[in-house]
């Protein structure tokens, strides 16, 4: 029953006026304002305030207080303080409420009659974060009669509420506030976008109060069930659910054991909406057809005013309407429907203006919009729909009208709910049971499971309604037609049968008078619309669609039941709409049916149910068929036959019981009196009407009063003896249960949801905009991942569709299509011409580029002082201060280009002269790049100083480089060629001219630097600054090659606004844009604004007035690279945060850009990357590159408050109150700036407002904020600290966060140290900031226009030295700007710190980054670890001399061609993987030494697919446990064999040893990895990660094996990522076993664990006998073969070592229950376990001794490798055990066995020279020499220890490789300091064979 809002809230609405003519008095106004401030203290905007006033909530628009969501706060507070106190009586408890809110609530109640108890129970983890001091554990039960829960009901399920009542016998009422949008029931868009916005996902929705997604929170999508729930039935009692108060999305629920309101429906507020006619959009979602009435009226007026509107005109008109802010909630799908409606409406016969005949409507609308609908709508239906819609436009406001449901719980199934939108959790078996229930009337198993009926009726005794049986027979016929060859004849007979039946029913007039008749009955139509639609769409789509014309004709000729006819018309329209491809769709359906076992099972389901149902015999099955056949007849025939059949069955029944109860219909009962959900149409139960007692006073039962208000309802709850006004149980079999199990769409989408990895639909372009719009609509409704493939000819203009997130059950469905350019004509006046031509075919070479025009001479800027270019000086080491390239040339920026043979083999002609000091400047070093290329921006040619020598010519490229440059890897994409200088001001584009006019024409010209763009493109390709798809990676290769091929050179005009934080740089730029937008509305089509972050993009889009399309005009910096379609003007905000080289790449890809406008601050943070060898770290940063182009410098800020500005030493014009405070406690309501990124992300996930030092740049906090300073702050750069200090316009609070009494550690940063000393010495902070500003500002002060009048230091005492202008306009000199390399933070380096003490966690900074890790770490002992020495990066350069012979050079073809001659081409070695539709990317394809080895990448989907298919095995936990129990005997055999190898006595468990192992494990876990690695793995410390859940990925590695050189792509290595708690818990026990096994090892057994190669060499020299043969072996799929047998072996080993029993059981449980996102896994070994190498080695020993007779000789083991110094024979009893193991061994017998890559030879161990040779060649190109050279050198020296004995067991080819290696490392040691030190400590032997060989 709908309660009028005026009456419901009359008591709470305050009236401030005495009468209609007089206003309130001053006293009344002040009283009312004070009353309003209690629940609405914050300022509310005009739009939300008007909505709140409609529901009796007054607000204050001029309040000085602000809030992030003031309107929702007022709604929440009004319910909390004004309404809730009415429902709290007697003893009550309050859960989940803040302390201050509880005190406010306590002040509103009567303390004499009500007692409140506060139990701050946290419902979710987010509440624990927001409300400190909450109790995370559930309190268990409520001890009071009434319980109040604040905003928690939406997170609770009916089972949770019922359990709470069951465990709280004293509780009789639950009063709860909840925020549940009522439109979420149908997934409609937000009805009130001024108050909140919604975002729907697969299983939850995101609720953004006041549209602020920064404060948004998630809630389960199933929470909307509380909106339509009337009662909650359980096995013990029944609960009533009422909603006495509701305002927009805020509701008050009362759940009690007392009876509730006698309502059958529940209404909620809704804006004035209308529903578009169904005739236009059959089968569409209702949410997409509900549009605001005013918007539809505008379209109706438009359609009536034009002669004939096309779809293009209607689309343009719709966009013009939707641009209004009040229609912001209208989705693109709704816009599409409105456009179709307008174009079709203009061609229909309107009531007052006929335009065209009615018959033209089908041709004009259906043929044009839906080309595949080849039939016409009947005229009767058109008139009916048009009249209904016109009437609908005159109806009052549309309301959300929900029918209330009764929620049933059953005790035997844990109250599972199958019909309330829980289809995701239902298994396929449950869904098949639902199909059975729909097809054949009832399934006993389904009835037993859902309704809890333990004695269901037999299958044959439940008669089917005619509609259900008829549809079941149609399904069976459809299945036969799909399977059997003669399906055409059967389909013809089926259509004829239904046609004859329909004709008989229609022709016979007696049938038309019956309320329910045959196929056209109301009950059939209702069932078809709800439950039958699933089967109609699913199993027999073609059959049902072919019978649709019959339904049409029947609907037209049956005017007595128009509602039923309309339903049938809708069903037919749905079928025609979805299956519009006819024969093709039939072929696809048939093919999938035959290939897919799941679909085949669904199609054969009728046969299975018919022949394998629950009937005990064939007799009963045939009886069921007879029953269904009878049910298909009309009612006047079927009912007597069913009665006769029941009588016959009664006579045959021996116990005279009626097995088939027939409920005959009552002639006096109507359709409304009968239950349509019941298969037998039983009568509804009558409501019990108790007799009125004469002693009863009418007001004693307030539920019967006419005016039902909140007060009346609250009073009714106090009555405990009120009888329930409705039945408490529903005894009908709900066939509608299956309606919630499957989606409402067609079956193939349902099957994709269930079995998504078996179907992929590729839909191509049909040339119309409708196709992709319809696909986008389906993707939005089903929440599919949409991937778009764009044709090459459309790439230039296409902007892309929004990609939906959230795969279905972890699977992706790809909808690929080529777009139609529907918006090309709406882009404005300026047309950029046709798109570039497509690339040439791959078989032909690309056309040669045209000769680029000569660059015009550069004209100096039109300013007084011309900027001079500073020459980079060389330091004492011969390195440039602005680069970290050492002595590499520009072409060597890419390490993929190898040095030529001349670089390493050529002898210098003379001894190299030492470099002289830089101060003498007698000679200038070789330039880094050729003179034709630019290192960074050069404003003008710089004259060479007279005392400097001329620059030598650049090194000529080698022949290899030329060949690589002339042979592109693939055809080049369309890239710009040629180039030109920037046009003059009079030749600029009109938009660029306008910007130049605003700066008085004083723009500057900037030359695009090619090396910077090359560096950025290579970083982008390697993933150093982000990840990109494979297709884009190939395009980047083409862009990199095009630099050399096309020789692109150009220059652009620039305007650079520079200044300190808060000086209005961005505001000045946006004001210019806003001014020009007002003058020229088409300017937005030619100007693009680029920001570094999404937050800044949204902020800039909101600042511009009128607001622009944020997704089109304002972009992030990735968009111009992915979609290069910029206009003439590019505005870059916060350019300092852009990667180095980004702008040059954008200008290269977007040749139309003529002007670039920057805003940047050199004193704030710059772009950072965690990749230390990234190219962007080696070139000047973005702000350093444009230092000489500053057009305007702004130094006076208007952001910080005077108190904050004085403390920071900054000039300001602000007058806001504020100062710098210090504290140690966080305020959760303040904006927080933290140093840890994962902590900030974690807080933001749960509703906090937290930034990092880097992400806060560009933001302005208009209220107080706090900055956290802890041990991790010292790893940040001064620029980021300065940016974080200057973000706010109010109070700044410094929070010093420590975990112990010890002070925070210091660093070399003066600004950080000044922040630490601020509490004691605040004067150091302004000095540190002044020094920081002086470090970067001076280079920006030359040739700038000062934004303020020049004043000297005396007149401006607040000015910094860097800002003081000397006479003549020159600024004071300062220190040169630091390079980016010297200013990088050290967070990526390995931080070695002392061991952690439990009471002193501050000494371990890693724990501050990983908050959850602290709870897993044990006690530590004090120890000191020296700081590791990081070798200086050294790159290989030019030639250097050697004394060795040169008969075997490094690039001798005899060494290289022998390996590479027989290799396949790179493009033929990668393989195509059909499952993912991609090719592996394991071969580099560069044509150099990198092609020798395969490279596994972590982002290679194809390699991951074949890896998982080969490495993983799947099984359920129960099967794993059974396997463990069945293999105990085989496990004991392994353990017995292991004891023969290593005797293990029974011992007592050593607890002290375990503690040592725990300390060692924890210390190694934190100190062995760099801090950056721990930060990247921070998610492994999340407590929400399940202990038995692993995350799988492939290991990124290079396969450097001799047998894999030049091979085809292979499977990689799968890595399992466990939760950190699992690793830290099991690590000590693994170390314990390792220590005990080492202590018991026999002297002749060697385990290569925690040993070095020198240890292995010593063991071989002491124990190996080279006079006899040895046996070595390897296994195939060794990890996957570690099954349950080895688990039993490992448990026996633990028992022998006296492990605690609970530890052993926990280990077995973990091995049996491991699961992943692919599903539960079988028992196997995973790379990533703490046991992997240990148990692999021990299992190898056990298996070897179980299979072979092994003598007591020298033997070595390591993982799956082994080598035994003797031939071994198979044991006699092995034949009985061979079937119990899955291991496949590959034994090899010989005199020179191999072990772990080493060859055991007389005299020692030797690394294979050929493998070491190619590894060196690969590493020389791929990595820095300092990283790989020392390790390979040690392996070479260890091999050479055998001296001249190598001549005996090495071939001449191996000796040639060895000689080349010795010669190379000898030369390299002269140039690499770290290798030279290693050579002095470990020199090459004097009798090296290289010396012997060099005598020739």
Curated annotation (Swiss-Prot):
- At the top level of its lineage, which domain of life is listed? Viruses
- UniProt xrefs under Pfam families: RdRP_2 (PF00978), Viral_helicase1 (PF01443), Vmethyltransf (PF01660)
User: In UniProt terms, what function does this protein have?
Assistant: RNA replication protein replicates the viral genomic RNA. The central part of this protein possibly functions as an ATP-binding helicase and/or methyltransferase.
* The organism's taxonomic lineage, starting at the top: Viruses, Riboviria, Orthornavirae, Kitrinoviricota, Alsuviricetes
Q: Which residue stretches does the UniProt record annotate as biased composition, category Low complexity?
A: 945-959
Q: Does the keyword Membrane apply?
A: no
Catalytic activity of the protein: ATP + H2O = ADP + phosphate + H(+); RNA(n) + a ribonucleoside 5'-triphosphate = RNA(n+1) + diphosphate
Specify the (+)RNA virus helicase ATP-binding domain's residue ranges: 1025-1194
> Which GO BP annotation is one of this protein's?
mRNA modification
Q: What is this protein called?
A: RNA replication protein
One GO MF term attached to the UniProt entry: RNA helicase activity
């Amino acid at each position: 029953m709908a309660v009028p809002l005026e009456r419901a809230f009359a008591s709470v609405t305050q009236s401030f006026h005495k009468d209609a003519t007089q206003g309130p008095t001053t006293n009344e106004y002040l009283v009312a304002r004070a009353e309003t401030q209690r629940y609405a203290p914050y300022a509310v905007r005009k739009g939300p305030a008007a909505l709140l006033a409609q529901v009796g909530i007054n607000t204050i628009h001029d309040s000085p207080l602000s809030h992030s969501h003031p309107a929702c706060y007022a709604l929440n507070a009004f319910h909390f303080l004004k309404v809730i106190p009415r429902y709290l009586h007697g003893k009550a408890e309050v859960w989940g409420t803040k302390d201050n809110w509880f005190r406010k609530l306590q002040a509103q109640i009567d303390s004499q009659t009500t007692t409140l108890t506060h139990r701050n129970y946290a419902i979710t983890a987010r509440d624990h974060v927001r409300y400190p001091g909450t109790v995370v554990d559930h309190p268990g039960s409520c001890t009071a009669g009434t319980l109040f829960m604040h905003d928690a009901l939406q997170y609770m399920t009916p089972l949770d509420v019922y359990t709470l009542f069951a465990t709280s016998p004293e509780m009789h009422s639950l009063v709860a506030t909840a925020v549940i949008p009522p439109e979420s029931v149908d997934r409609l868009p937000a009805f009130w976008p001024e108050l909140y916005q919604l975002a729907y996902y697969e299983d939850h929705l995101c609720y953004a109060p006041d549209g602020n997604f920064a404060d948004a929170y998630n809630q389960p999508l199933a929470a909307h069930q509380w909106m339509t729930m009337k009662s909650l039935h359980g096995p013990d009692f029944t609960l009533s659910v009422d909603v006495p108060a509701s305002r927009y999305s805020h509701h008050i629920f009362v759940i009690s054991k007392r009876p509730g309101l006698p309502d059958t429906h529940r209404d909620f507020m809704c804006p004035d909406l209308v529903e578009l006619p169904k005739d236009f959009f059959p089968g569409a979602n209702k949410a997409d057809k509900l549009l605001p009435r005013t918007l539809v009226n505008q379209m109706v007026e438009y359609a009536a005013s034009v002669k004939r509107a096309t779809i293009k005109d209607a689309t343009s008109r719709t966009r013009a309407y939707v641009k209004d802010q009040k229609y912001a909630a209208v989705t693109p799908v709704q816009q599409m429907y409105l456009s179709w409606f307008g174009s079709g409406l203009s061609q229909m016969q309107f009531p007052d203006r006929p335009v065209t005949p009615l018959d033209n409507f089908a041709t004009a609308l259906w043929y044009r919009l839906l080309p595949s609908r080849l039939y016409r709508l009947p005229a009767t239906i058109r008139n009916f729909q048009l009249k209904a819609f016109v009437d609908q436009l005159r109806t009052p406001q549309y309301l959300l009208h929900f029918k209330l449901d009764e929620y049933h719980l059953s005790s035997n199934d844990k109250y599972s709910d199958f019909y309330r939108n829980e289809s995701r959790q239902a298994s396929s078996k449950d869904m098949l049971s639902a199909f059975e229930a729909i097809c054949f009337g009832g399934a006993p198993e389904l009835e037993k499971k859902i309704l809890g009926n333990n004695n269901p009726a037999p299958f044959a005794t439940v008669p089917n309604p005619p509609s259900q049986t008829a549809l079941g027979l149609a399904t069976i016929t459809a299945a036969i037609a799909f399977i059997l060859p003669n399906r055409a004849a059967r389909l013809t007979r089926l259509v004829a049968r239904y046609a004859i039946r329909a004709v008989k029913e229609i022709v016979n007039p007696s049938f038309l008078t019956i309320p329910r008749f045959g196929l056209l009955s109301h009950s059939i139509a209702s069932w078809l619309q709800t439950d039958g639609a699933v089967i109609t769409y699913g199993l027999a789509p073609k059959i049902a669609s072919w019978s649709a014309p019959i339904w049409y004709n029947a609907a037209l000729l049956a005017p007595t039941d128009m509602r039923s006819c309309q339903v049938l018309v809708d069903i037919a329209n749905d079928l025609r709409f979805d299956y519009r491809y006819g024969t093709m769709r039939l072929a696809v359906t048939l093919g999938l049916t035959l290939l897919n076992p799941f679909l085949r099972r669904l199609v054969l389901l009728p046969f299975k149910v018919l022949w394998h149902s629950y009937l005990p015999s064939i007799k009963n099955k045939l009886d069921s068929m007879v029953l269904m056949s009878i049910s298909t007849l009309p009612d006047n025939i079927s009912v007597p036959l069913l009665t006769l059949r029941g009588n016959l069955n009664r006579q045959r029944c021996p116990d005279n019981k009626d097995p088939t109860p027939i409920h005959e219909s009552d002639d006096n009962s109507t359709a409304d009196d009968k239950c349509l959900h019941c298969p037998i149409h039983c009568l509804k139960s009558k409501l019990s009407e108790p007799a009125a007692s004469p002693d009863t006073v009418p007001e004693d039962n307030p539920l019967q009063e006419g005016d039902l208000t909140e007060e009346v309802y609250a009073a009714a709850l106090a009555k405990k003896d009120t009888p329930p006004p409705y039945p408490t149980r529903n005894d009908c079999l709900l066939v509608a249960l299956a309606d919630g199990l499957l989606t409402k769409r067609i079956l193939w989408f349902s099957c994709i949801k269930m079995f998504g990895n078996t179907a992929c639909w590729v839909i191509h372009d049909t040339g119309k905009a409708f196709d992709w719009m319809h696909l986008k609509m389906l993707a939005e409704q089903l929440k599919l991942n949409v991937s778009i493939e764009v044709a090459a000819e459309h790439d230039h203009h296409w902007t892309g569709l929004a990609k939906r997130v959230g795969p279905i059950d972890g699977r992706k469905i790809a909808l690929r299509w080529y777009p139609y350019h529907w918006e090309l004509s709406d882009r404005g006046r300026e047309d950029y011409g046709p798109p570039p031509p497509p690339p040439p075919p791959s078989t032909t070479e690309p056309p040669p580029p045209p000769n680029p025009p000569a660059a015009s001479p550069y004209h100096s800027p039109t300013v007084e002082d011309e900027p001079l270019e500073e020459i980079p000086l060389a330091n004492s080491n011969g390195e440039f201060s602005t680069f970290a390239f050492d002595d590499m040339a520009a072409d060597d920026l890419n390490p993929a280009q190898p040095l030529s043979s001349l670089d390493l083999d050529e002898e210098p002609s003379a001894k190299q002269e030492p470099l002289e000091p830089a101060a003498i400047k007698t000679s200038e070093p070789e330039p880094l790049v050729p003179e034709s290329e630019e290192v960074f921006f050069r404003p003008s040619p710089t004259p060479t100083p007279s005392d400097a020598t001329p620059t030598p010519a650049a090194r000529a490229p080698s022949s290899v480089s030329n060949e690589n440059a002339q042979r592109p890897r693939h055809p080049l994409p369309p890239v710009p060629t040629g180039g030109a200088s920037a046009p003059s001001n009079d030749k600029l584009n009109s938009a660029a001219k306008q910007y130049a006019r605003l700066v008085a024409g004083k723009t500057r010209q900037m030359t695009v630097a090619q090396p910077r763009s090359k560096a950025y493109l290579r970083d982008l390709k390697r993933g150093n600054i982000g990840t990109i798809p494979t297709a884009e990676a190939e395009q980047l290769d083409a862009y990199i090659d095009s630099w050399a091929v096309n020789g692109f050179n150009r220059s652009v005009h620039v305007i650079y606004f520079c200044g300190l934080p808060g000086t209005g740089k961005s505001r000045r730029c946006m004001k210019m844009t806003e001014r020009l937008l007002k003058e020229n509305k088409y300017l937005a089509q030619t100007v693009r604004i680029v920001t570094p972050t999404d937050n800044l993009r949204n902020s800039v889009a909101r600042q511009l007035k009128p607001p622009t399309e944020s997704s089109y005009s304002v972009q992030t910096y990735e968009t111009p690279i992915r979609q290069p379609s910029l206009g003439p003007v590019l505005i870059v905000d916060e350019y300092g945060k852009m990667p180095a080289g980004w702008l040059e790449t954008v200008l290269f890809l977007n040749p139309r850009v003529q002007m670039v406008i920057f805003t940047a601050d050199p004193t704030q943070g710059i772009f950072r990357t965690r990749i230390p060898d990234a190219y962007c770290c080696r070139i000047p940063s973005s702000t350093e590159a444009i230092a000489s182009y500053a057009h305007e410098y702004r130094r006076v800020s208007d952001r910080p408050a005077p108190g904050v500005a004085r403390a920071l030493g900054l000039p300001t014009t602000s007058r806001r109150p504020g100062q710098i405070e210090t504290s140690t406690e966080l305020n959760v309501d303040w904006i927080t700036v933290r140093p840890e990124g994962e902590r900030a992300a974690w807080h933001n996930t749960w509703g906090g407002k937290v930034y990092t030092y880097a992400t806060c740049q560009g933001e302005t906090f208009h209220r107080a904020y706090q900055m956290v300073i802890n041990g991790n702050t010292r790893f940040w750069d001064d620029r980021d600290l300065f940016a974080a200090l200057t973000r706010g316009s109010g109070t700044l609070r410094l929070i010093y966060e420590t975990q112990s009494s010890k002070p925070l550690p210091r660093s070399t940063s003066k600004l950080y140290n000044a922040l630490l000393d601020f509490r004691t010495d605040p004067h150091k902070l302004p000095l540190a900031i002044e020094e920081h500003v002086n470090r970067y500002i001076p280079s920006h002060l030359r040739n700038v226009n000062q934004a303020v009048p020049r004043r000297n230091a005396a007149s401006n005492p607040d000015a910094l030295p860097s800002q003081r202008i000397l006479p003549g306009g020159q600024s004071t000199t300062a220190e040169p700007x630091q390079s980016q390399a010297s200013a990088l933070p050290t967070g990526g380096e390995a931080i070695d710190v002392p061991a952690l003490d439990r009471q002193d966690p501050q000494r371990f900074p890693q724990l501050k980054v990983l908050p959850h890790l602290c709870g897993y770490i044990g006690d530590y002992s004090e120890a000191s670890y020296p700081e590791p020495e990081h070798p200086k990066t050294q790159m290989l350069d030019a030639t250097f001399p050697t004394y060795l012979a040169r008969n075997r050079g490094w690039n001798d073809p005899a060494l290289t061609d022998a390996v590479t001659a027989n290799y396949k081409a790179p493009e033929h070695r990668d393989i195509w993987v059909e499952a993912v539709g991609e090719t592996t990317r394991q071969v580099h394809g560069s044509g150099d030494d990198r092609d020798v080895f395969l490279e596994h990448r972590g982002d290679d989907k194809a390699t991951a697919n074949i890896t998982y298919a080969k490495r993983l095995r799947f099984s359920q936990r129960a099967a794993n446990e059974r396997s463990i129990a069945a293999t105990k005997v085989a496990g004991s055999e392994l353990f017995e064999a292991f004891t023969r190898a290593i005797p293990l006595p029974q011992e007592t468990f050593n607890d002290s040893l375990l503690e040592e192992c725990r300390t060692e494990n924890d210390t190694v876990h934190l100190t062995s990895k760099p801090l950056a690695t721990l930060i990247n793995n921070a998610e492994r410390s999340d407590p929400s990660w399940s202990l038995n859940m692993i995350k799988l990925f492939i290991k990124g590695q290079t396969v450097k094996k001799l047998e894999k050189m030049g091979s085809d792509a292979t499977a990689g290595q799968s890595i399992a990522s466990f939760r950190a708690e699992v690793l830290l818990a099991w690590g000590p026990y693994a170390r314990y076993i390792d220590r005990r096994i080492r202590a018991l090892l026999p002297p002749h057994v060697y385990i290569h664990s925690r040993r070095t190669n020198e240890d292995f060499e010593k063991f071989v020299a002491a124990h190996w006998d080279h006079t006899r043969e040895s046996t070595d072996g390897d296994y195939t799929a060794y990890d996957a073969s570690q099954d349950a047998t080895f688990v039993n072996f490992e448990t026996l080993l633990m028992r022998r070592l006296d492990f605690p029993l609970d530890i052993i059981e926990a280990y077995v449980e973990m091995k049996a229950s491991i699961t992943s996102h692919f599903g539960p896994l079988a028992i196997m070994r995973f790379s990533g376990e703490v046991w992997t190498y240990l148990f692999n080695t021990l299992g190898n020993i056990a298996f070897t001794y179980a299979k072979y007779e092994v003598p007591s000789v020298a033997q070595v083991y390591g993982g799956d490798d082994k080598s035994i110094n003797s031939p071994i024979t198979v044991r006699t009893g092995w034949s009985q055990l061979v079937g119990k193991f899955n291991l496949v061994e590959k034994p090899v017998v010989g005199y020179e066995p191999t072990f772990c890559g080493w060859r055991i030879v007389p005299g020692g161990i030797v690394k294979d020279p050929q493998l070491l040779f190619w590894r060196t060649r690969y590493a020389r190109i791929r990595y820095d020499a300092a990283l790989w050279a020392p390790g390979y050198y040690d392996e070479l020296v260890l091999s050479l220890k055998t001296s001249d004995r190598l001549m005996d067991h090495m071939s001449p080819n191996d000796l040639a490789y060895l000689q080349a290696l010795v010669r190379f490392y000898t030369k390299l040691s002269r140039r690499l300091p770290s290798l030279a030190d290693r050579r002095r400590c470990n020199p090459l032997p004097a009798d090296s064979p290289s010396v012997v060989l060099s005598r020739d």
